[in-house]
């Protein structure tokens, strides 16, 4: 269900005076919510003039799987670009030695207790734009589980030339329900990735999702999170008739998107029992040279850990 679109882009830092100095990756990292201009406040007010009706909103919820299946029927594997950036942003995804699973950086073998294969679950795997770049880049330390609400997306993952059930398993799943426990056992995962997926879920169901993930993950395991941030350009551009609720919208194709505040993400994970290791807004200026477009993007990025068992 991932929703970061495919386009030729070049990222530059956001030089807005209100924000701190950009990081060396060209991003601006901050815990402050964007300050709206008068024009931007007017855009949000316009959205309220015609809201999605409660009947329409309920219908969208019931038909969420259908809309994502239709999305992948239209777009197949062409819509999203491969996420080779994830290992740059989340070093936890890196293998100790990409060439030899179970080997440390100096070439020595880990002991038997340490040599157990790590397990990773990508929630909202789409067509595999995170997991297959990991494999292509040599990070094969994991047994990978990959799930998506859309059975069509999962079928596209299974058809990929790198799909191999010796070290991965893709399956359809509604992560808002206990359905996932039919495939993945409790306390079995080292890492769970949530990359542009929670935004596609009704905000009222998010606590249940994070609670399920807490049950799945091992003590000391990690959740890696990235999603749309409050007042992102895409949120401001919605017209009247697309707003379902506060910061929650429907696109033309029937898929939905929520825009997160940094503090609500932290609260969501803390209430489920996670420790917040990192959580902040990422302000990025995205330039589409082909279309001569220069737009500011806002994401929330975080790392959340299930507390380790006391020794």
Predicted feature residues:
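Conserved alpha-helix/loop element of class I SAM-dependent methyltransferases that forms part
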Residues: 79-117, 133
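Class I SAM-dependent methyltransferase SAM/SAH-binding core
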Residues: 114-181
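A short acidic, Gly/Pro-enriched loop at the edge of an enzyme's catalytic core
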Residues: 180-192
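A short SAM/SAH-binding and catalytic strip from SAM-dependent methyltransferases
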Residues: 189-205
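Core SAM-dependent methyltransferase catalytic element
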Residues: 274, 285-311
């Amino acid at each position: 269900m991932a929703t970061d679109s495919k386009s030729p882009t070049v990222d530059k830092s956001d030089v807005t005076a209100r924000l701190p100095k950009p990081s060396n990756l060209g991003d601006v990292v901050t815990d402050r919510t964007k300050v709206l201009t008068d024009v931007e406040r007017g855009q949000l007010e316009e959205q309220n003039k015609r809201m999605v009706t409660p009947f329409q909103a309920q219908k969208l919820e019931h038909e969420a799987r259908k809309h994502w299946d239709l999305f992948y029927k239209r777009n197949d594997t062409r819509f999203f670009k491969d996420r080779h950036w994830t290992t740059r942003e989340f070093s936890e995804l890196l293998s100790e030695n990409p060439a030899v699973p179970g080997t440390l950086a100096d070439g020595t073998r880990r002991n038997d207790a340490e040599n157990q294969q790590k397990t990773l679950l990508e929630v909202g795997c789409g067509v595999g734009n995170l997991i297959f770049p990991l494999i292509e880049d040599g990070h094969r330390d994991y047994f990978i589980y990959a799930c998506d609400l859309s059975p069509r997306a999962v079928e596209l993952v299974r058809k990929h030339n790198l799909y191999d059930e010796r070290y991965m398993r893709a399956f359809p799943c509604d992560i808002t329900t206990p359905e996932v426990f039919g495939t993945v056992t409790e306390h079995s995962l080292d890492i769970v990735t949530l990359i542009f997926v929670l935004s596609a879920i009704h905000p009222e169901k998010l606590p249940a999702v994070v609670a399920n993930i807490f049950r799945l993950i091992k003590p000391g395991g990690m959740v890696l999170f990235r999603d749309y941030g409050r007042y992102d350009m895409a949120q401001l551009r919605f017209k009247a008739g697309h707003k379902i609720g506060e910061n929650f919208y429907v696109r033309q194709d029937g898929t939905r998107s929520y825009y997160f505040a940094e503090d609500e993400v932290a609260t969501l994970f803390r209430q489920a029992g996670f420790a917040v290791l990192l959580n902040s807004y990422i302000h990025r200026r995205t330039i589409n040279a082909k279309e001569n477009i220069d737009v500011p993007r806002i994401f929330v990025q975080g790392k959340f850990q299930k507390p380790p068992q006391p020794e």
